[in-house]
Amino acid sequence: MASSISEQINHLRSTLEQHSYNYYVLDTPSIPDAEYDRLLQQLSALETQHPELITADSPTQKVGGAALSKFEQVAHQVPMLSLDNAFSEDEFIAFNRRIKERLMSTEELTFCCEPKLDGLAVSIIYRDGVLVQAATRGDGLTGENVTQNVKTIRNVPLKLRGSDYPAELEVRGEVFMDNAGFEKFNIEAEKRGEKVFVNPRNAAAGSLRQLDSKITAKRPLMFYAYSTGLVADGSIAEDHYQQLEKLTDWGLPLCPETKLVEGPQAALAYYTDILTRRGELKYEIDGVVIKINQKALQERLGFVARAPRWAIAYKFPAQEEITKLLDVEFQVGRTGAITPVARLEPVFVGGVTVSNATLHNGDEIARLGVKVGDTVIIRRAGDVIPQITQVVLERRPDDARDIEFPVTCPICDSHVEKVEGEAVARCTGGLVCPAQRKQAIKHFASRKALDIDGLGDKIVDQLVDRELIKTPADLFILKQGHFESLERMGPKSAKNLVTALQDAKATTLAKFLYSLGIREAGEATTQNLANHFLTLENVINASIDSLTQVSDVGEIVATHVRSFFAEQHNLDVVNALVEQGINWPELTPPSAQEQPLAGLVYVLTGTLNTLNRNDAKARLQQLGAKVSGSVSAKTDALVAGEKAGSKLTKAQDLGIDVLTEEDLINLLEQHNG
């Protein structure tokens, strides 16, 4: 009997999985929805009677599980990179040209094109064909574990079809809510008196990030796969489109508009076609993604910053509306940048209500010729940032008034300075300016800086507004009573904050330098400064020439660092912080044995086949070398990989030593790097 029940259950599962595959992957439903539901109910009833036969990959397990208290963090083994954007045909043509120049090829490229879905990127890991983990993109390196929620999405297979899949397979794609599902969901939510969402993307995000997966299971979420991440035993196909076809064979849904095209003109035609049919599609999109199809070419092109060179998101023109400019206010940022902000009559555009827009700077105001009282065209650039793009001059009222850019800071009345060659005007008040003061202290306390637990933005705002602090150093003279006087701060929270401030005094030189908020000096830069100069005094006294000797520090960053420490009020704050007990472990200069390449300048060019470019750079730096991005008379050696171009020619002209990748590997092994 048990065998018969087991056979019934297995038969129902395979039948339901086949119908799901027909419906979601092949887009050819083979039975009515009611019949599918009836079969699912039969399976559920049998599993309820025989719980020992329930498996994790059963279609009935898409109903959700126990609620979570919070999402755990998941590190992506292969980073989930973002894409560079193109907003015009010229920008896409430039992208195509850059690729061909880098490949040194005149042949037309094959592109894989697909709509850019307006949802959330997720990673789904299958182990031995079974879904074991799902995570959001997060910051690209770390995301949130949403496994239980993704399991409830109806077109996500809990078990892959077939048997030829890798032992471990990471599938990447987009979770979204189609237009019909979104409309139905909002209507039902409104009837129940619950929150309605302004657009499908917000609805998808809110649904996927539910701590209770049973709630997610009731939401009409969908998933389309678009790539892979980690794959056991290497790639599953020689080109991207073949890879997608393999995914569909294994039961994963693919956007039906995905298409292979030859050459840039065909890619542009695809873009135009999708843009024309945008309103007819069943889901929201904000552009198309265009990728080089051949995996070998993708590997040769590699990555820049946090985006691949071989793909681009060609965004659609933002949706536009007409509204009225009511006023312009000037905001002051942490670095003193003066930014004009347009206050608008609220208008619904691109899925949200917009009442503010950036005017960027004085040059943009002059270019637009805009006045207060004008009727303007507003758009959301890239469907994100509201912008004024045009003035409707025929509607200009008689009482329209010019926008006067301030000559003094609207916050502290200090002089406003506009450096030649820069579009941004800045307040010269530094840490005297309350606007900069708040942002400077928030930056100082942030996680990547001194990481002062409990010192949130609202507390900083209150401390500055009440004039309890004027500089970061003032934080360390505050007593528990000062914090207890703030809104929503009880004795326990105040005591914890005092303790956190004391704990934060023990830091590193790199974090301390980062906490000062020097323009364009990020985490990597301040770490390199600390490693190079070893002491705060050395950094303070460093000349621009000596600063540019630091790895990854160019003349612009060096100038910002030098200018910061040339200002006495900045030095006063630094000295006060040290006097308050900020400290870090003493750094000792590495020995000649530890850094045998100290003082030497290397340049990497071309494709490295054995070493990862970033790994090679890091290993050279560990041995004391400076790795530069350009060849000059100061370069000691050039490492030339395959397809080395103009840098190799210049190095040969200058008589600079040229190393092969094999030479570099031998050099690193010689010095145990």
From Swiss-Prot:
Top-level EC class: ligase
Active-site residues (renumbered): 116
Domain BRCT: 592-673
One of the GO BP terms on file: DNA replication
Entry keyword set: DNA damage, DNA repair, DNA replication, Ligase, Magnesium, Manganese, Metal-binding, NAD, Zinc
Disulfide bonds: none
InterPro entries named in the record: BRCT_dom, BRCT_dom_sf, DisA/LigA_HHH, DNA_ligase, DNA_ligase_AS, DNA_ligase_CS, DNAligase_adenylation, DNAligase_N
Swiss-Prot/TrEMBL catalytic activity: NAD(+) + (deoxyribonucleotide)n-3'-hydroxyl + 5'-phospho-(deoxyribonucleotide)m = (deoxyribonucleotide)n+m + AMP + beta-nicotinamide D-nucleotide
EC number, as in UniProt: 6.5.1.2
GO terms assigned for molecular function: DNA ligase (NAD+) activity; metal ion binding
Cited function: DNA ligase that catalyzes the formation of phosphodiester linkages between 5'-phosphoryl and 3'-hydroxyl groups in double-stranded DNA using NAD as a coenzyme and as the energy source for the reaction. It is essential for DNA replication and repair of damaged DNA.
Protein's name according to its UniProt entry: DNA ligase
Source species: Pseudoalteromonas translucida (strain TAC 125)
Lineage start: Bacteria, Pseudomonadati, Pseudomonadota, Gammaproteobacteria, Alteromonadales
Gene: ligA
